[in-house]
């Protein structure tokens, strides 16, 4: 992503900065759903950025695939990054009408569908109903005690000292007319805002 937005010469800077952050250092050694889910979201963002025209069929296919795989990992939580990507998706909306996107979406959901049909015979009702009930329960019985602005201060503090540069860069990108602002500014702001509204 660094190479796509800036240049290849200093692309190593981003992973070096990431490796020094507390959250990455704390979670990178754990084989949890969150790590796999984060990787899938990163693949989705990368593939969306790489879509320059209708001829980029591989990346269009890949963007469809990650949605289904991420849904299998975290179910409805996949809509958080998708909502955050809406401005950029709208900017590149033409690829949504290409069959490779829908083919990728189908391929991505195949593991989930296979798991669903495998487990349903052992349940008294379809697994989808259980997932919806779980979602409704978490929404109505919210045990998330932190205030709505929790992520707005916690994320910058956790990523110190790099958060200072991130805030400056976000403000700068918003003022620019380039398409970079959809990923570098709008995406993280909408993502944090969405996480602040709904309990995770």
Positions of the model-derived regions?
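Transmembrane-lumen/periplasm boundary regions of multi-pass, lipid-linked membrane glycan transferases
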Residues: 51, 69, 73, 78-200
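Hydrophobic residues within membrane-embedded alpha-helical segments of Major Facilitator Superfamily
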Residues: 17-18, 24, 40, 47, ...
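Alpha-helical membrane-protein architecture signal
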Residues: 17, 24, 58-65, 144-149
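Membrane-interface transmembrane helices that cradle and orient dolichyl/undecaprenyl
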Residues: 3-9, 44-62, 70, 173-174
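Transmembrane-helix signature of polytopic, membrane-embedded enzymes
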Residues: 2-20, 38
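Short acidic/glycine- and proline-prone juxtamembrane loop motifs at membrane-interface regions
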Residues: 23-37
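Hydrophobic core segments of transmembrane alpha-helices in multi-pass, intramembrane catalytic enzymes
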Residues: 18, 37-45, 62, 80-84, ...
């Amino acid at each position: 992503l660094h190479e796509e937005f800036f240049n290849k010469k200093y692309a190593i800077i981003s992973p070096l900065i990431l490796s020094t952050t507390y959250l990455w250092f704390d979670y990178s050694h754990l084989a949890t759903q969150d790590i796999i889910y984060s990787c899938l979201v990163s693949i989705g963002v990368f593939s969306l950025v790489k879509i320059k025209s209708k001829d980029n069929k591989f990346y269009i296919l890949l963007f469809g695939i990650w949605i289904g795989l991420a849904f299998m990992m975290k179910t409805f939580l996949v809509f958080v990054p998708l909502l955050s990507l809406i401005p950029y998706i709208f900017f590149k909306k033409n690829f949504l009408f290409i069959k490779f996107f829908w083919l990728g979406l189908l391929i991505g959901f195949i593991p989930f569908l296979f798991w669903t049909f495998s487990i349903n015979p052992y349940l008294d009702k379809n697994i989808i109903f259980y997932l919806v009930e779980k979602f409704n329960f978490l929404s109505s019985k919210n045990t998330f005690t932190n205030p709505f602005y929790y992520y707005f201060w916690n994320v910058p503090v956790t990523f110190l000292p790099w958060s200072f540069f991130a805030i400056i860069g976000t403000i700068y990108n918003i003022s620019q007319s380039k398409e970079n602002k959809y990923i570098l500014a709008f995406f993280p702001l909408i993502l944090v805002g969405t996480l602040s509204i709904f309990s995770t």
